[in-house]
Amino acid sequence: MDTRIFVGSNTPLGFQSFYGEKLKNIARVYILKGGPGTGKNTLLKKIGQEASERGLDTEYWYCSGDPLSLDGIYIKKLNIAIVDGTAPHVIDATLPAVKETVVALGDYIDEAKVRLYSETIIELAHQKSAHYKRAYKALASARKIMEAEEDLDEGIIYNDKLTQLAASLAYHIRRA
């Protein structure tokens, strides 16, 4: 059975990665390196699809910044993972050739074609960075508001009664 999860998240404290925990006990890790547009997501999707079609249970690790994109896959029976090793979840080989193999997709870029769009690429990279900064500020602000509301609620809301109400509602919903 295939599984779909996020192995990182965007939080009020910035990007939080759980890749280290996920990769700790995996026998073989292929780390994809390369900038935007080098085919990391496409390669991950194709390999994941092929593994699934062959009946291999596959864990799909989705990107917290773009939930339509993959940041990695884990093929359980083979105990191998293929991951995007670029920011914000930078992954580098700690045991090259023993446990990890770095795949430099950037080596296959047609640099002449990319240079034609260099101004656009630079502008979009700056915009992306600015949007992430704004998003993290918004998440931090939301956290402060939530904490302030919790402080206000303290002593007003009876948590045990709220828990009983939630349990009662869940019971009635299940019976309906």
Give the ranges of each region predicted by the language model:
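Conserved NTP phosphate-binding and transfer environment spanning the P-loop NTPase/kinase superfamily
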Residues: 1-10, 25-30, 36, 111-176
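Conserved nucleotide-sensing/catalytic segment adjacent to the nucleotide-binding pocket
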Residues: 3-12, 49-121, 126
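Pre-Walker A adenine-sensing motif
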Residues: 11-23
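Generic local-structure boundary detector
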Residues: 17, 41-43, 69-72, 84-86, ...
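Short, low-complexity cationic-aromatic patches
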Residues: 23, 38-40, 76
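Glycine-rich phosphate-binding P-loop
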Residues: 28-51
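Small-side-chain structural scaffolding
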Residues: 44-48, 81, 135-142
